[in-house]
Amino acid sequence: MKRSAVGWWFAGVLAGFTGLAVNYALTEWFNQPGAVIAVADFVRDHSPAGIVNWARENSGKKITVPAILLILVLVFALIGRLARDRWWVAVAGYGAVGVLGGAAVLTTNGATVARLVPVAVGYVAMVGALSLLGERLGRLQALDDQQVFGELWRGRRRDFLVVVGAVFGVAGISGIAGRVLGGDVRKQKEEQKSLRLPVTAPVVPSGVRVDVDGVQPWMTPADEFYLIDTAFSRPVVLAEDWSLRIHGMVDREIVIDYNDLIARDGVEAWITLNCVSNEVGGDLIGNAWWSGTLLAPLLREAGIQDGADAVLQTSDDGWTCGTPLTEIMDGRQAMLAVAMNGEPLPRDHGYPVRTIIPGLYGYVSGTKWVVDMEVTTFDQIDAYWTQRGWGELGPVKIASKVEVPSSGDEVSAGEVVVAGTAWIQHTGISAVDIQVDGGPWTSTDLGRAASTDTWVQWKATVELEAGDHTVTVRATDAQGNVQTSVRADVLPDGATGWHSVDFTAT
């Protein structure tokens, strides 16, 4: 293969990604979804339910964007190679990529024709970059065809490399600009720092911790709190621009802004959240000090009409969930949260406002970046995850896990401390028992329950001889219901079964 031919493959890829970098910079600056992210969102929203559910449970979101970029590498390389002899291929090929990206952008939430401008500019950057690279490559190609090498060939190669460096520079600067200079991202960070919310700092209640090394902290730091959402690029919403619309089966529509919300009577509570995708013994769970405003008074203010049994919540990015109305109105601390652990909500956890409803899995309750609530009935709605086979109501199930020792650990024979956590929000845990090597169940010591809406820690000391051992845990809730041993998958409404760990005493 001639050396200039290889250069065309490379030039096609470099020009293509220069256009993507320019698109990225513009969309970050204007707080719009980029073309690649829009395509990823489109693929997610239009994939079969089985694929979406697999992706949710297997970190599929992490590979979608890289997979799209890999496909683009191949497409751009082919465009570059074909453009060597047929320049119109570059115009048409990059144009086709732009059309697909633009079509995906127009399907994003709140899209207008104006969102096509960054796509168009990115397309021009692609064609322009390949034109510059192609001109230099054409000169090299002419020498290749004539079998002319030596100093003339080396000089033209230097010219080509200078242009490559310039195009790389444009791509790199565009990428950095998108990362660093995103207007609303910077403004949001400044806004969060300047907020003076009427909230208190968290104080961990006395007696809730069992003080065993290896048991996860009773209060989960915000940067360690689990993250599960469908967003490939999380929305950037400013408090000054935020509003919530409450409508549907109500006597009067209500629209409140951020200042209205924080001026209302506040509520603060320790609440444990866990994901419906959490496997038995999994770590998709956390406990935090949430501050906000109760949701029930707002709905009463709107005037709930007879027959309503659901609230369709919508996020700024268009994600939806259907929430049972009863669980909002029954007196639990269902809130519009504005702070987490005494600080404004982090962007990843829904800044400026998200919903928190104790006792329900997040897929039917925990809407981050919430902007709309429609009071309605379940037979009139089809929310994001229920469309994909998940249950309609989503009540949290009783669960427990062994955290100390971990599976595969080696411990000293004799007295061995076993410890972990248990939870069933809005009901509460009354007892936790463990079983060693299939023997009788024995009780454990519980940490104090801060409320029925938080997890509890537990511990026990057992006497073990040298050898391999298995410890199993089960919990009993405040109503006397014992955790089932029956293993069930997370789909459609949460996993069940006892958690066990295998370890060795030496």
What role is predicted for each listed range?
Residues 71, 79-155:
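N-terminal secretory signal peptides
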Residues 29, 33, 76, 84-89, ...:
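Structured, non-membrane catalytic/scaffold regions adjacent to prosthetic-group chemistry
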Residues 121, 130, 161, 165, ...:
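Short, well-ordered alpha-helical packing segments
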Residues 1-85:
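Membrane-anchoring hydrophobic segments
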Residues 9-13, 70, 92, 116, ...:
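Alpha-helical transmembrane segments
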Residues 148-168:
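N-terminal secretory signal peptides and thylakoid transit peptides that target proteins
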Residues 23-28, 104, 177-179:
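C-terminal TM-helix exit segments that contain a strictly Trp-centered aromatic cap at the helix terminus
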